[in-house]
Design a protein with these regions (language model features):
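Short, surface-exposed amphipathic charged segments that create phosphate/polyanion-binding patches used
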Residues: 232-236, 290-292, 389-397
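Conserved residues at the C-terminal ends of beta-strands
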Residues: 257, 277-279, 307, 345
């Protein structure tokens, strides 16, 4: 833990919001200074980086990062800010949802989500508070250390600038019927993807067909009624059923319906990875967000956060039939070398206008893959890489370093250094383009 000047980690501040180094929004108890209980648009108390502070942060880095990733800042926020609509309204909505057309649903959702663009935190359209804070900690270490650069294992295999993950949540019969055509479309652009299937949909044959074509199948909630995380007892009962179905189908990943979540309950799910946490959830019924564009562990489960707007929200809530917002989010995530992840529903892109938007996105990703060295992979491959990377170690090698451990043949040594007041990265031995081979 970073310590204060007395040599012991202490705090007198109340738990709340503050900024560090003028940019990173934090939630926790700093070792000095004040906090704000709520975010109301006023400037937050700032803990300036002191030039002669040495390798000491004025905050508990682990606590603040966990609070943001696990969305614990929601504990003191007004409930209306993070759950849009009462439970009775949500129950009624999900009871009649199957018979509502998209036109009626999007009208109701626009009413329910009114004011979403005025929510101050997490920052829209991409929040990288955790990543900014980690970079500030690196800056402090570089300032305090004698070496001009610090080695680390690069985030992605083969020196790729960022990771890309395409996923398809299948909500109903209409979506199930379009899965085959959607796989063909993804294949035509060389984009691997995963399909999340509702276990109670009776679509075992569709799951087998998807897997036979080389695509991933994951589970999507239990029955998509929006109640999975309503209370702990119900969740644990359904978790047993979900786990049993995952074993039968050989599924390694999970995503809840409508991105409802309670990360502290994830240990009851027997999956290698989860995809239920958005980066910023202004357009979801459950507000919040993990404030990072990087995968992270929740216990033994790797969280692969959703870092871009869902197709339904883009097309039917905002009403934007271009990929301009997606392109903006991609650039913001690329600047952080993060995971660019998408949800595109086969239920909503099977008509001409919506399908054309998705084709534009696929074409854009295909161009960027070559121009910007993106690693485009299904979630299972990303989970395997990230777990391997966590177990890798830097090994001294003459005057430099090499990476040791399983999968290290695809790993790259990178160096962080300061360019003025900015942390910059240099990748050693990066290839011209990411490789598709495994080791």
């Amino acid at each position: 833990m970073f310590q204060d000047d007395s040599g012991a980690a202490t705090t007198t501040a109340d738990e709340g919001f503050f900024t560090y180094d003028g940019d990173a929004v934090c939630y926790g108890r700093p070792f000095r200074g004040n906090t704000a209980k709520y975010l109301n648009g006023d400037p937050l108390p700032d803990l300036a980086m002191e030039p002669h502070s040495g390798p000491r942060l004025p905050l508990d880095l682990s606590e603040v990062v966990t609070n943001l990733r696990r969305e614990r800042y929601r504990r003191i926020r007004p409930r209306a800010e993070f759950v849009a609509g009462s439970s009775s309204v949500r129950n009624l909505y999900y009871a009649v949802r199957p018979v509502l057309g998209v036109a009626i649903r999007k009208h109701l959702q626009r009413l329910r989500l009114a004011g979403w663009n005025a929510i101050p935190f997490p920052r829209w359209p991409v929040d990288a508070s955790v990543d900014t804070l980690m970079r500030s900690a690196m800056k402090l270490a570089l300032r305090a250390g004698e070496a001009p650069r610090i080695p680390f294992i690069w985030f992605w295999p083969d020196g790729a600038d960022a990771g890309v993950m395409m996923t398809h949540d299948v909500e109903g019969e209409r979506g199930l019927k379009y899965c085959d055509a959607l796989m063909t479309l993804d294949e035509s652009f060389g984009i691997p993807s995963s399909f999340q299937i509702v276990p109670t949909s009776g679509a075992a044959d569709v799951c087998v067909a998807i897997q036979r074509r080389g695509f991933e199948v994951n589970l999507h909630d239990w029955n998509h009624d929006g109640r999975l995380f309503r209370d702990k007892r119900l969740f644990l009962k359904r978790a047993e059923l979900i786990n049993a179905q995952a074993r039968r189908l050989g599924c390694r990943g999970f995503r809840s319906a409508v991105m409802y979540r309670e990360q502290d309950w994830f240990d009851a799910l027997e999956f290698d990875y989860d995809m239920s946490v958005p980066n910023v959830a202004h357009l979801d019924p459950q507000r919040g967000g993990c404030c990072t564009v990087m995968p992270y562990f929740v216990g033994d489960i790797l969280e692969l956060p959703l870092t871009t707007i869902q197709d339904y929200s883009l097309l039917h809530v905002i009403g934007d039939y271009s990929i301009a917002l997606w392109r903006r989010q991609i650039e913001l995530i690329l600047a952080e070398h993060g995971l660019i992840s998408f949800i595109v529903h086969p239920d909503y892109v099977n008509t001409k206008r919506e399908n054309e938007v998705y084709v534009q996105l696929l074409a854009h990703l295909n161009r960027l893959r070559a121009q910007r060295k993106l690693w485009v992979a299904p979630p299972g491959d990303i989970e395997r890489w990230w777990r391997q990377r966590q177990a890798m170690r830097l090994v001294p090698d003459g005057a430099g370093w090499r990476v040791g451990g399983d999968g290290s043949c695809r790993a790259r040594v990178a160096y962080a250094s300061l360019d003025g007041d900015r942390v910059v990265y240099e990748i050693e031995g990066a290839r011209e383009a990411p490789l598709a081979s495994r080791c």
